[in-house]
């Protein structure tokens, strides 16, 4: 009996060690898989754009947001925050955000004065979507690649708003074009709720 008890304790100990190792490694594995997936999608996007341009050298098609929600519409790069993410069509539903960073609204246009893009923030995954956006500051550069265009922006405003404050999505007539980047902020460990939204506004550099 004692022999079996010792064996069971040994097995239980091994299982606990394996579970602990898995829990420790999981965020790193998830980050690796996410980075690999997004890099492949960005590479494929650039390849598709280049192929399309070579087919139609005389007339460069104006970049458009795909109607297919699973297609990449472009990608955003923020060097100061070590962010480079493919951007998907809106709206930023849970399903779309599972694919990746996406336009906040369904009717978003690349010609809008205020282009809004939303992305997740995860506590234990620093490389995931907009988690590290907090490393950006006023003056940080933002690059938005759509088709053959690389649009340049500079961070001009960073602030918190309530989740219900949808005014950040509004067009602002008479003002320079801008990107509005949206992610979660102020995580409440007791309720498991992100109580605020962090808003990063980047104004186009002409």
Swiss-Prot record:
Site features described as Transition state stabilizer, chain residue numbers: 197
Record Gene3D superfamilies: Sortase
Disruption phenotype: Mutants fail to cleave and anchor surface proteins. Protein secretion pathway is not affected. Mutants are defective in the establishment of animal infections.
Membrane-spanning parts: 7-24
Single GO MF descriptor: cysteine-type peptidase activity
Effect on the protein of changing residue 170 to A: Retains enzymatic activity. No change in dependence on Ca(2+)
Activation and inhibition: Sortase activity is regulated by monomer-homodimer equilibrium. Mutant cells with monomeric SrtA display more adhesive proteins on the cell surface and are more invasive than wild-type cells, which have majority of SrtA in dimeric form. Dimerization may suppress the enzymatic activity on cell membranes. Stimulated by calcium ions, which promote substrate binding. Calcium ions bind to SrtA and modulate both the structure and dynamics of a large active site loop. Can also be stimulated, to a lesser extent, by Mg(2+) and Mn(2+). Inhibited by sulfhydryl-modifying reagents.
GO cellular component, one term: plasma membrane
Residues that hold Ca(2+) according to the record: 105, 108, 112, 114, 171
Reaction equations catalysed: The enzyme catalyzes a cell wall sorting reaction in which a surface protein with a sorting signal containing a LPXTG motif is cleaved between the Thr and Gly residue. The resulting threonine carboxyl end of the protein is covalently attached to a pentaglycine cross-bridge of peptidoglycan
Effect of residue 120 to A: Almost loss or loss of activity
Annotated phenotype, changing residue 143 to A: Does not affect dimerization of the full-length protein. Disrupts dimerization
Keyword terms of this UniProt record: Cell membrane, Hydrolase, Membrane, Metal-binding, Protease, Thiol protease, Transmembrane, Transmembrane helix
Record topology, Cytoplasmic segments: 1-6
Impact reported for residue 120 to Q: Almost loss of activity
Region (Disordered): 49-69
Subunit structure: Monomer and homodimer; in equilibrium.
Function in brief: Transpeptidase that anchors surface proteins to the cell wall. Recognizes and modifies its substrate by proteolytic cleavage of a C-terminal sorting signal. Following cleavage, a covalent intermediate is formed via a thioester bond between the sortase and its substrate, which is then transferred and covalently attached to the cell wall. This sortase recognizes a Leu-Pro-x-Thr-Gly (LPXTG) motif, which is cleaved by the sortase between the threonine and glycine residues. Utilizes lipid II as the peptidoglycan substrate for the sorting reaction.
Family statement: Belongs to the bacterial sortase family. Class A subfamily.
The protein's name in its UniProt record: Sortase A
Gene: srtA
């Amino acid at each position: 009996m004692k022999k079996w008890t010792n064996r069971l304790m040994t097995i239980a100990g091994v299982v606990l060690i394996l579970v602990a190792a898995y829990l420790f490694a999981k965020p790193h594995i998830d980050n690796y898989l996410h980075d690999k997936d997004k890099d492949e999608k960005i590479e494929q996007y650039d390849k598709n754009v280049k192929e399309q341009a070579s087919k139609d050298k005389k007339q460069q098609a104006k970049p458009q947001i795909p109607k297919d929600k699973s297609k990449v519409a472009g990608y955003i790069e923020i060097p100061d925050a070590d962010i480079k993410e493919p951007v998907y069509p809106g709206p930023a539903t849970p399903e779309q955000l599972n694919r990746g960073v996406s336009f906040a609204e369904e009717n978003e246009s690349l010609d809008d004065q205020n282009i809004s893009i939303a992305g997740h923030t995860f506590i234990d995954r620093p490389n995931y979507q907009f988690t590290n956006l907090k490393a950006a500051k006023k003056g940080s550069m933002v690059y938005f690649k759509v088709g053959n265009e690389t649009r340049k922006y500079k961070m001009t405003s960073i602030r918190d708003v309530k989740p219900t404050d949808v005014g950040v999505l509004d067009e602002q007539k008479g003002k320079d074009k801008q990107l509005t980047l949206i992610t979660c902020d102020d995580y409440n460990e007791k309720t498991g709720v992100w109580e605020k939204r962090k808003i990063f506004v980047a104004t186009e550099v002409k």
